[in-house]
Amino acid sequence: MTLTRREFIKHSGIAAGALVVTSAAPLPAWAEEKGGKILTAGRWGAMNVEVKDGKIVSSTGALAKTIPNSLQSTAADQVHTTARIQHPMVRKSYLDNPLQPAKGRGEDTYVQVSWEQALKLIHEQHERIRKANGPSAIFAGSYGWRSSGVLHKAQTLLQRYMNLAGGYSGHSGDYSTGAAQVIMPHVVGSVEVYEQQTSWPLILENSQVVVLWGMNPLNTLKIAWSSTDEQGLEYFHQLKKSGKPVIAIDPIRSETIEFFGYNATWIAPNMGTDVALMLGIAHTLMTQGKHDKVFLEKYTTGYPQFEEYLTGKSDNTPKSAAWTAEITGVPEAQIVKLAELMAANRTMLMAGWGIQRQQYGEQKHWMLVTLAAMLGQIGTPGGGFGFSYHYSNGGNPTRVGGVLPEMSAAIAGQASEAADDGGMTAIPVARIVDALENPGGKYQHNGKEQTYPNIKMIWWAGGGNFTHHQDTNRLIKAWQKPEMIVVSECYWTAAAKHADIVLPITTSFERNDLTMTGDYSNQHIVPMKQAVAPQFEARNDFDVFAELAELLKPGGKEIYTEGKDEMAWLKFFYDAAQKGARAQRVTMPMFNAFWQQNKLIEMRRSEKNEQYVRYGDFRADPVKNALGTPSGKIEIYSKTLEKFGYKDCPAHPTWLAPDEWKGTADEKQLQLLTAHPAHRLHSQLNYAQLRKKYAVADREPITIHTEDAARFGIANGDLVRVWNKRGQILTGAVVTDGIKKGVVCVHEGAWPDLENGLCKNGSANVLTADIPSSQLANACAGNSALVYIEKYTGNAPKLTAFDQPAVQA
């Protein structure tokens, strides 16, 4: 039901489960290598892990780098934190009466049970719910970042089990790019956000101006969907050394802007006004005759309709630089200068994703493509636009060699009965609370009327929805509705503390796996070797679902595993990659030798791929290489969207003022920016020692402009209460001139820690609005919120976010 990021990006490899093989000669499950160093990997790259006496004592990056990655130091914290779930647990009220628990989720104590008891209880209630309500009542979308690896993919393994059981309700899209990945196929014929970018060597050689629009790669390139190849940061370092001018458009002076120093010009518009700023630039280009009419005529459709809007012919409002300045807070002269600079130089517009995680977020990337089209540089070396330079090292040229396939939710030789009777469904990922609140409700999505399933059971594996979903208090209320909620987790997250049944799962350091580095480059294959024994009673997801499959039917375990254990699957994946490498005339060692060598494999560079230009073929021949849009061209005006008739997503890029922004704020309200943190992967590692690098008064920091802080009597280091109609949080003040006046920043990902309505840890999503971006994409809009702030003068409550819950003996 779910198309993953990796599947968007990867166009090679084979489906897992097509062939049954037996294990090769036995290999050690884990071992302390020479010097106690074991090679493994995580989202934050290949790592050498040091083990002493069965415990991880340190971890360091395994790849050479110029810019250090703090996340690579966290292996010991991940395995040995006191936040680990140690045993299978069941909520007491649920254990007493699964059909009618006396207490609500989040209000109960837990009882330790055996694995056998836990799995039996899950199986019995799962079967009951499925038989009574059908497969659509089982939600197994289970969105989240999980751990790296091609085998131990929590979400996929869950869905593999649910397919064997008869189907489930899943999700579509993701929280990262939910708006863009739905609008972009209408504009350029692909999701775009997960496509390879024009190569970095061509950027460095040909780009004269680089615009970083709402992106902070110094933070976001510490990670990747598989494992970072670490080259993106190296290329940004080379860009800095080149001295090329960088324009950074962002309400906050990010780590990236600080990194570029004097090379960077920082422009700080009012939050949520990016479309208006782009329109002002576009209007200036048009009035000065600097828009590329030839490109617009040959490669796009619908520009004349858009120009009527731009000039004000259609609505009596010219989108001039003066009009833009009033909305954005960016001076008119600077807007004009921006337009002239972009037109006079080979300009690469690099955009992040935060700007589309807003109400009407679909308009942001659409308008940026339109601006790039007006400049006429799309498909040229170093020109045009790119939406993935900040993610997974987009632009690092794709290597030639083997590509690892991955575990599939489909089982060889098995077809889900639900697929035949219409029982499989998917809801937009950020509309889970809407679905729980409105079972059977109708909603519009991408031109079609859809129906929410009546969800009775939820299983979440490898994700933390209580941190990544908006409006936490609304989520908690909706979370009471299902009859059973199971969470498979390594840690006592807020989601785990609101589950009926909690299963302790291994970290990636307690099992064996494989991964690629570089979602675009496929640069390395890395052995993810088990470093330590499973902690406490933790088990692998693969083994948990295999056991549950046996409870479904005799022989279910054999069907689920396809007769392969952990090492046999890894050999199967590796052998497939080796076969692909051989076809490319790249030599890889045999699997046993590779595994025992404790070394990664680097694939061969490709001179052809180093010259890759996004949309280069389209520019060379737009007929032969037509885009996947109805016209085959870039669609500035979409007749498809015109037919949809959505007022919140018109047929061309449009400035639509959000419900909560500077223009609707009272004199005491500030706009809330929820940026990506420097020392976490979203909510992952919130418990780690890295917390000492950023926490203020042991809380999530809030960045406040100097003048705003003075106005509210707040000093650096003070505790600050932040609130609105949705909730309240406690934060620690960081006072600076490095943020737009009228904007505060609380980085996303802090674990919710609620007591008497106050989140003691400072989770931003307690404050954000759970509204759809529009009827088109129904994506999250976490960057559209207004808040109040005040100095907190009460006694600071004890932080309990990382504590074990109360357990009844």
Swiss-Prot record:
E.C. number(s) listed in UniProt: 1.7.2.3
Gene: torZ
PANTHER family linked to this entry: TRIMETHYLAMINE-N-OXIDE REDUCTASE (PTHR43742), TRIMETHYLAMINE-N-OXIDE REDUCTASE 2 (PTHR43742:SF10)
Name of the molecule in the record: Trimethylamine-N-oxide reductase 2
Disulfide bonds: none
Enzyme kind, highest EC tier: oxidoreductase
GO molecular function, one term: electron transfer activity
Lineage: Bacteria, Pseudomonadati, Pseudomonadota, Gammaproteobacteria, Enterobacterales
UniProt subcellular location: Periplasm
Cofactor binding description: Binds 1 molybdenum-bis(molybdopterin guanine dinucleotide) (Mo-bis-MGD) cofactor per subunit.
Function recorded in the entry: Reduces trimethylamine-N-oxide (TMAO) into trimethylamine; an anaerobic reaction coupled to energy-yielding reactions. Can also reduce other N- and S-oxide compounds such as 4-methylmorpholine-N-oxide and biotin sulfoxide (BSO), but with a lower catalytic efficiency.
